[in-house]
Amino acid sequence: MMQRCGITEVSQSLEENEDIRLVLVKRGAESEQLAKILTMASDRGIRIIKGSENDIWRMSRDNSEGVPEILALVGRDPTLDLDESIEAGGLIWLLAGAAYPVNIGFCIRTAEVSGADAVIVDAELSNTERKAAKRASMKAHRFIPVHWGDGLQAVKKAKDSGFRIISVEDTGTLSL
């Protein structure tokens, strides 16, 4: 995943026809340049999310010159389903048996900012606990596909698609 940060980078990315999948724009931000970018993105069918200044600050790779008005996500499509995520390839994290929503959320956020292409969560969570995990992730699920389901099935699908499986665990007894 690559991020384009600020009006200049996002505009250049659009002009160069990069594979922008999502645009995050600061709610209430207005300028002629920004309007032009948003029109171009909309015309190309690129999903646009309006976020708070805090959202933009958290998601931005560079705040050295202040919080940018706009960010663009290039390459990674957060709307992919599990099969599409596997087909797209890349690095997919699997959290198997994680029990605490906050820990799951931190892992989702870490995967997102480290450049992973998707996250699979195999955990027994209620809807309330899933919402808590998404909140703890700083709502990173908006920017990376997060799949909730059977981890073993996901591993089998990934292996069948040629993925190399690397496992890190501390108490497991099952070899995948």
For each predicted feature, which ranges?
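A short, structured active-site edge motif that brings together acidic residues
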Residues: 49-58
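Conserved beta/loop motifs at nucleotide-recognition and modification sites
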Residues: 79
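C-terminal edge-of-domain segments
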Residues: 69-74
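A short, glycine/Asx- and small/polar-enriched loop/turn
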Residues: 64-67
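Short, charged, surface-exposed secondary-structure boundary motifs
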Residues: 33-34, 59-60, 176
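Short acidic loop-to-helix transition motifs that present clustered carboxylates
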Residues: 56, 172-175
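RNA substrate-binding interface of SAM-dependent RNA methyltransferases
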Residues: 8-25, 29-30, 35-46, 82-173
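Acidic/glycine-enriched edge-of-secondary-structure segments
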Residues: 1-5
